[in-house]
């Protein structure tokens, strides 16, 4: 038994979609979450800067005595995950491979779409992972840079959000049967995305998919939390306004949480 928390990092609030699924599947595990909303989005930034920011988040989580770090951010996974994983002596998990694997299982026509930040799409990481495992699958990637600002400003239900999603996804409509939400912010726009793509298109939440891998690693390294502990204390940190973060988090997690401000 290991009661240390699991650390989550993201460029902002998007990683809460992963946390929500972890709380549902593994309610006995403690969580420490750091969202760098003050510098979001990461997607348009240079690789060097993304790597620097990611390491700052990682080092913060290490001060919290975490037993595992989850990159709840596709952009950080694409740019820095391999380097961080090689440098640390605790498990470090990204969200890309679980999402890619789920897309392979989902598609029936071999036509998969991937939406993400400009950096995630430019890295071509999803296509590489998918076609490494299933070379016959055709992957269409599309950058959606306007999605993260919508979520970070808590405008997910606005009319402008609907227009932006509709306009952004137009190149993929009718061309795929599976769509990977290759940014953990995007599930917060899921109802609009599903409406635009149509009911026949399966949406893959890369963050939610990675929770299964978290469970596997906890078992493999024998670092599961206390199964008998009914109430666990989670800690949430943001580099931006805690009130905005708290508002979005409370809606998504369906519970009131305390959010602390941190300067990196």
UniProtKB/Swiss-Prot annotation:
Supply the InterPro entries for this chain.
Asp/Glu/hydantoin_racemase (IPR015942), Asp/Glu_race (IPR001920), Asp/Glu_racemase_AS_2 (IPR033134), Glu_race (IPR004391)
The catalytic activity of this protein is classed by the Enzyme Commission as 5.1.1.3
Gene Ontology terms describing biological process: cell wall organization; peptidoglycan biosynthetic process; regulation of cell shape
The answer on whether this UniProt entry bears the keyword Cell wall biogenesis/degradation reads yes
Tell me the pathway.
Cell wall biogenesis; peptidoglycan biosynthesis
List of residues binding substrate: 10-11, 42-43, 74-75, 184-185
Q: Which top-level enzyme class is recorded in the Swiss-Prot or TrEMBL entry?
A: isomerase
Q: Which UniProt keywords apply?
A: Cell shape, Cell wall biogenesis/degradation, Isomerase, Peptidoglycan synthesis
Q: Which GO terms describe its molecular function?
A: glutamate racemase activity
Annotated catalysed reactions: L-glutamate = D-glutamate
Q: Which protein family is it in? A: Belongs to the aspartate/glutamate racemases family.
Question: What interactions and quaternary structure are annotated?
Answer: Homodimer.
Cross-referenced PANTHER family: GLUTAMATE RACEMASE
Tell me, in a sentence or two, what this protein's role is: Provides the (R)-glutamate required for cell wall biosynthesis.
Q: Which NCBIfam families match?
A: glut_race (TIGR00067), PRK00865.1-3 (NF002035)
Protein name per its UniProtKB record: Glutamate racemase
User: Which organism is this entry from?
Assistant: Streptococcus pyogenes serotype M1
